[in-house]
Amino acid sequence: MAYVLTETAAGYALLKASDKKIYKSSSLVQDLKSSENVLKQFKVAAFSKFASAANALEEANSVIEGKVSSQLEKLLAEAKSDKKSTLVVSETKLANAINKLGLNFNVVCDAVTLDIYRAVKEYLPELLPGMTDGDLSKMSLGLAHSIGRHKLKFSADKVDVMIIQAIALLDDLDKELNTYAMRCKEWYGWHFPELAKIVTDSVAFARIILTMGVRSNAAETDMSEILPEEIEERVKSAAEVSMGTEITQVDLDNIKSLAEQIVEFAAYREQLSNYLSSRMKAIAPNLTQLVGELVGARLIAHAGSLVSLAKAPASTIQILGAEKALFRALKTKHDTPKYGLLYHASLVGQATGKNKGKIARVLAAKAAVSLRYDALAEDRDDSGDIGLEARAKVESRLSQLEGRDLRTTPKVSRDAKKIEISEARAYNADADAATAPADSTPADSDDEEEEEKKVKKDKKDKKRKREEDAEEEDSKKSKKEKKEKKEKKEKKEKKEKKEKKEKKEKKEKKEKK
């Protein structure tokens, strides 16, 4: 006996096939080409209706995840017989789950079953009594929307997609701002070349162009809102003796248009940076406290989502962003990179030399814990206490490695060590003597002689040890060479013996003939 389990938007349908070995048929596609053949081949053995739309969503998710719900288990238990029957299922995970139940079914799910399901789905309204094509389409559409909403799990506070887009836009804005600022300095530099050396800030440079216009207006222009007083004086004095060429009003208008773009871009960049900061504090407060908004946002963007990053181990977080260097190192059998995007974290930046790698490893481990709390904790608060605690521990480790106090995170204050004040010595007049007795030898000279002897002895010991090591290496090499020579000699002798034997055998054969 063969059954086909069909999941519809209305409920579970268990179809009984008239041919027991339908899934083994060689002409299956031809047999199920028309509605008459399908209706003749399959009949509804049992149907379990969904109670509501919520129930339909729950059952559909169970099938997608490869789980057997209580409703489906009940349907299969009622349909099972004493003889072992074949059950055709569409999902491999679901087939494995049904097998584990221990029901009297031989569960089948392979490429052939797809043809059966294609035919059943096409003529499903005709197979199910009291079900029209329109009703089934409406139910399927409603269920599809419900599954889509369930998968998205939309929440205004936990949309990491916004972070990914914001950090990508922020990087693009930085590139555009740098390009525009460089072009503006080069363009206006023909008229007032000294200004770029005095005012290095791009936004301030653009605002001066908008306020001042041509350099001849510098003396009458008030720049106190843009520049400090001493720099303003330098700009005005440089404008009087500038080596730049004169420009027309049309040129100035175009330069001003570019300067306006720079000012607007800078204002929008600041607004976007504040938005990203607030989003990061809402979505990943602990990660933000530990590595900062920008590094945290780049990690999330690189991983694809907060949950994907939270699932990653600390070793992956440590080298995230250095994939090219990692695979190049593995290919060439060199040392693998110690850090990726975490290199830009302030804590790694405070470390020096070889300590950077150690701090990156510690920071990655703490970031993994903070991320899992941010992404997966049910009763999470947005205070970022776990991130602060983790940062304090990383700072403590950094201070220990660097040998100086680098802690910035507030910590429980310990009792200050008491300072002991010792009495000053009385003045010793005898110590002012110009000369000391000739026969009295100072104790310091004896100590120095002993130290010199000790240093010489250490040097001799080291030299002797080096010589012994060199001799040992030479002896090892000579032994190895002797062994290799012996092996070569033995191989040569064996080869010669073999050749002699073969010649002898050939000679004997010839004589016999």
From Swiss-Prot:
Does the keyword Ribonucleoprotein belong to this entry? Answer: yes
Q: Which GO terms describe its cellular component?
A: box C/D methylation guide snoRNP complex; nucleolus; small-subunit processome
Q: Could you tell me which residues belong to the region Disordered? A: 428-513
Entry keyword Ribonucleoprotein? yes
Locate the compositionally biased regions of type Basic residues. 456-465, 477-513
The family assignment reads: Belongs to the NOP5/NOP56 family.
Name this polypeptide is given: Nucleolar protein 58
Originating species? Eremothecium gossypii (strain ATCC 10895 / CBS 109.51 / FGSC 9923 / NRRL Y-1056)
